[in-house]
Each structure stands twice: as C-alpha cells, then as structure tokens.
C-alpha cells in the first residue's frame, strides 16, 4: 500500500458521496444475492433519504475510508447496541463495512476493522459485533480478525434468492 489511508467521521454533507459509494461497492460484490439486479435493496438501503434518516439517529456514526484523499469505502457503527443474548457486555455493532472492489486485497479492510476496534475501545466497549452473509468470503476475513461465530440470522426479503438469505452473527471481545 503506497499512499495515505485516512478514516474520518462523516457528517450530513457526505450523504451524496456515501450513497454513491454504497451502491457501487454493494453492486460490485452482492448482486448474486438478488433476483433483480440488486436495485430493490440499494434503493431501499442506500438512498439519500435513508442515509438522512440514519444520520438523524444519535447512536449511529459513519466513517469514510479514503486512500490518497479519494473515498474507497465506509463504515457504519451503532455505538450502544448490545448483542442479543450477550447484553451483559457493553457492545458496539459494526453494521456496515463496504470497500470498493478496487481496494480489495490491499490491507484496507484490515485497517478499517482495526480502526473500529480502537474506536470501540475509546468508547469503553467490551465487545464489537456484526452480521455477515453466510455465503460471503468476508467470513474468513472476520475470523482472521479475531471474530467468532455466536449465532445465525435469516433475512426475509422476498426478492432475495432463498439460498442466500442466511447470515452469521460474529463477535469479538475487546477486553
């Protein structure tokens, strides 16, 4: 990795960039999940209005991942969200982490997740958790980052191919 990686907190002025980045990154990786071209989900999850709604939630924080000052990804953290079944831990959820395909394999994902660990620790969190598609190559990445599987979840989106609706719930203890 030659160049400067930067991760910064987003604000509402970043919504347009976040929306475009989310749609592009999602479609580069997850189109196989859908019976359509993924438009139903991306229109629902990554619209300007949806990002505005999520920015209005004081528990949510977005971070832009930049390489040489160009956006290559983003993360969404839910600062105070216990993992069901593990409520005795002060936990943070890594709800979304998306990187452009062109940024894959360069260590940016590892740096972004390490940033999340440090950020969670700065907020005195004992655990960070996430959900990942059970058909995703990301599961191996998360296990290398120290996450362990603690449960399963199933999405109920009718337009999603049934064989790809499974998710794994993963957690990492920080203390």
Language-model features and meaning:
Residues 120-131:
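Conserved GNAT acetyl-CoA-binding A-motif
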Residues 46-63, 93:
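A short helix-loop-beta-strand connector motif used in the catalytic cores of GNAT acetyltransferases and
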Residues 105-118, 144:
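Conserved acetyl-CoA-binding loop-helix of GNAT-fold acetyltransferases
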Residues 129-131, 143, 148-165:
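Conserved catalytic-core motifs of GNAT/GCN5-like acyltransferases
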Residues 26-53:
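Conserved GNAT-fold acetyl-CoA-binding loop/helix
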Residues 1-16, 173-175:
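Conserved N-terminal entry element of GNAT/NAT acetyltransferase domains
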Residues 97-104, 133:
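A short, internal acetyl-CoA/4′-phosphopantetheine-binding micro-motif in the GNAT/acyltransferase core
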Residues 64, 70-79, 93, 98:
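Conserved beta-strand in the GNAT
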């Amino acid at each position: 990795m030659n160049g400067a990686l930067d991760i910064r907190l987003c604000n509402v002025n970043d919504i347009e960039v976040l929306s475009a980045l989310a749609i592009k990154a999602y479609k580069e990786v997850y189109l196989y999940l859908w019976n359509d071209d993924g438009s139903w989900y991306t229109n629902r999850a990554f619209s300007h209005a949806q990002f505005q709604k999520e920015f209005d939630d004081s528990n949510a924080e977005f971070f832009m991942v930049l390489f040489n000052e160009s956006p290559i990804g983003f993360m969404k953290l839910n600062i105070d969200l216990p993992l069901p079944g593990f409520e005795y831990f002060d936990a943070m959820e890594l709800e979304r982490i998306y990187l452009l395909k062109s940024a894959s394999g360069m260590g940016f994902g590892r740096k972004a997740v390490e940033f999340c660990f440090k950020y969670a620790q700065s907020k005195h969190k004992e655990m960070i958790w996430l959900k990942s598609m059970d058909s995703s190559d990301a599961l191996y990445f998360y296990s290398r980052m120290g996450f362990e599987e603690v449960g399963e979840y199933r999405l109920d989106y009718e337009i999603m191919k049934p064989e790809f609706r499974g998710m794994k719930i993963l957690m990492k203890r920080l203390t």
